Amino acid sequence: MRHPAFRLTLLASTVAFALAPQAAQAAPSAADRIAGTELIARDALFGNPERANVQISPDGKYLSWVAAVDGVLNVWIAPADNPSQARAVTQDTARGIRSYFWSYQPDTLLYLRDSGGDEDFHLYAVDLKTGQAKDLTPFPKTTAQVAGVSPKHPGTILVGMNDRDAQWHDIYKVDLASGNRTLLEKNDAQIAGYIADADYTLKYAQRSRPDGGADVLRRGANGAWEKFDDIPFEDVLTTSPGGLTLDGKTLYFTDSRGRNTAALFAIDVASGKRTLVLEDARADVGGTLADPATGKVQAVSVDYLRDEWKVVDPAIRADLEKLEAIGPGDVSVNTRTLDDKTWIVAYSAAEAPLVYYRYDRSAGTLTKLFSARPKLEGKPLVPQWPVEIASRDNKTLVSYLTLPRSADANNDGKADAPVPLVLLVHGGPWARDSYGYGGYNQWLANRGYAVLSVNFRGSTGFGKDFTNAGNGEWAGKMHDDLIDAVQWAVKQGVTTQDQVAIMGGSYGGYATLTGLTFTPDAFACGVDIVGPSNLNTLLSTVPPYWASFFEQLAKRMGDPRTDAGKKWLTERSPLTRADQIKKPLLIGQGANDPRVKQAESDQIVKAMQAKNIPVTYVLFPDEGHGFARPENNKAFNAVTEGFLAQCLGGRAEPIGKDFTGSSISVPVGADGVPGLAEALKGHTQEVKK
């Protein structure tokens, strides 16, 4: 497997010699190769978006979006016919607001906010007339879950709250004006989730079983829950009830039982008759578009190489065909008014960030509203290429390759010459990489690196067989898939064996640690962002409200409650092999991470120090599972950029002022990254929760 890498390296050296016959010269560095391409500032890529999450209120009265107020993201509204008359309606001064939605109550919107990344999200209602915000879940250590909104009851909302029992959410009907809550369901039955009809009657529920499967329950005539359906463990990530139409007559159900990829079915509530809505042999069904007045599904997305919308209701076929034909990139429908006359749509291409439009259905007109990141317009962004890579046991790994301009002059997705590569590993791991604009992909390509994002086994979206193939394979075949993808890139001439870094967050951080401990010669360096180092301590410290998911974790990873499981998890933990690390490692961690606790990073750093192995450890005291504050994200990426430049030879924008406003601290290894120690000397830490 190493011979192709050797030949590619030799070829590059030979070409360099042939072009300069009088004196042997080293092959140009990644920075030299891309020197003629404009360097895109980190602030343009990772600073606050100018406008994002654009929506329209159900009554069509307002446009809304998130944008910065004094550098902090807040919710803004404007008259739908006059976006220039915008005003901020929230006043967050710390982490910012990213998740919000409209209620059906006129002049009322809702948003979610946690503290310092602790993921104890509270739900707030904002009265647009008075500007007052009310915490609808004013209880400590409570994580709100929105369980239902209904146009039939615009003044109330269903909310799950775990203030009584941290593990399980009780269901309340909450009055938006007063904040008063009425208990609808005390969750003594360990229910993982509920489905309510438009009158807020709880009709269906799902409960996890000790075998890792789940029971779907239905409310019986006597008011008690009774078993409605059975989901085996192997189907539980790809099978679940979705929701009811507004008349309560149809239940939508995503189902992989008796098949590989998940299909969408419609179930007649009265008769139990199941009707296939959509299936695809390549990939699981994804998101849906539903009629806002009836809840009837009208289109279903399927994402194999790229996301495609499949129309199942002719009423919107012409609309989607028109929108897809206009471009640029792939279209998504953000929100629709209740009368369905107006849609807010967004277009995204790999080489262009989101652009938002207003679509008037009756006139058939599309009006541009905003670009999420106008600073990137005209910048040298590059395409992304979907590829299918065969693993060593012949599984198909849908992956995405991004090439720097210096390596793909004719823009055909084929490397002209090998360049350093960053293997960018997604988190989850029960998630997936998809085609589209990615700030990290563009940033790394602009610095001179190829970027490869791989859907390794265990990823979701490609059928249950592919997902279940990852069971018990942390640091096993899941990691083999990443190694196989790198070998593919070497054989394709994208890179050479000695020029590959591994980087990722969450599971991607674990994959980075695995790469440097289980295969210590495979990568030139690694960047671990909030990755677990010890699978036993990871599983013993998950949030209490993950109780309904824990049996799945135990079956897919290893059971820390048994001796055999503990042994297995120890064997698959990078901490166990920390003494094998021989390549440079950068670690980033949020101190308030509720999923991957700070101890996960602390303990591997301590183990490396005990063996005198260098490491650079960056810690943010006001972050959780990832870096939400743009100041912190930019700060960490500034460190990462210098780290990768030292390791792979790409170019690096100086740290400059990118620590300003951040809470960055570097407990260990500040001298391991060029310019880091000096930048810290003049930095004043700003902690905002």
Curated annotation (Swiss-Prot):
Which GO terms of the molecular function aspect are on file?
aminopeptidase activity; dipeptidyl-peptidase activity; endopeptidase activity; serine-type endopeptidase activity
> What keywords sit in the KW lines?
Aminopeptidase, Hydrolase, Protease, Serine protease, Signal
Write the signal peptide boundaries: 1-26
Query: Would I find Protease among this entry's keywords?
Result: yes
Q: What pH dependence is recorded for this entry?
A: Optimum pH is 8.5 to 9.0 for the hydrolysis of Gly-Phe-pNA.
Q: How does activity depend on temperature?
A: Optimum temperature is between 35 and 40 degrees Celsius for the hydrolysis of Gly-Phe-pNA. Stable at a temperature below 20 degrees Celsius for 30 minutes.
The record's active-site residues are 506, 593, 625
Q: Which InterPro entries match?
A: 6-blade_b-propeller_TolB-like (IPR011042), AB_hydrolase_fold (IPR029058), Peptidase_S9_cat (IPR001375)
Enzyme class, first EC level, given as a word: hydrolase
Q: Which GO terms describe its biological process?
A: proteolysis involved in protein catabolic process
Q: How is its activity regulated?
A: Strongly inhibited by the serine protease inhibitor diisopropyl fluorophosphate (DFP), chymostatin, leupeptin, 0.5 mM ZnCl(2), 10 mM o-phenanthlorine and N-tosyl-L-phenyl-alanyl chloromethyl ketone (TPCK), but not by N-tosyl-L-lysyl chloromethyl ketone (TLCK). Activity is not affected significantly by iodoacetate (IAA), L-trans-epoxysuccinyl-leucylamido(4-guanido)butane (E64), pepstatin A and phenylmethanesulfonyl fluoride (PMSF). Activity is stimulated by addition of 0.5 mM CaCl(2), 10 mM EDTA and N-ethylmaleimide (NEM).
What EC number(s) does the entry state?
Answer: 3.4.14.-
Described purpose of this protein according to its UniProt entry: Exopeptidase that catalyzes the removal of dipeptide units (NH2-P2-P1- or -P1'-P2'-COOH) from the free amino or carboxy termini. Prefers substrates composed of bulky, hydrophobic amino acids at P1 and P1' positions. Has endopeptidase activity on N-terminally blocked peptide derivatives which contain aromatic amino acid residue at the P1 position. Exopeptidase activity is much higher than its endopeptidase activity.
Give the record's family classification: Belongs to the peptidase S9C family.
Its quaternary organisation is: Monomer.
Q: How is this protein named in the record?
A: Dipeptidyl aminopeptidase BIII
Q: Which organism is it from?
A: Pseudoxanthomonas mexicana
Gene from which this protein is expressed = dapb3
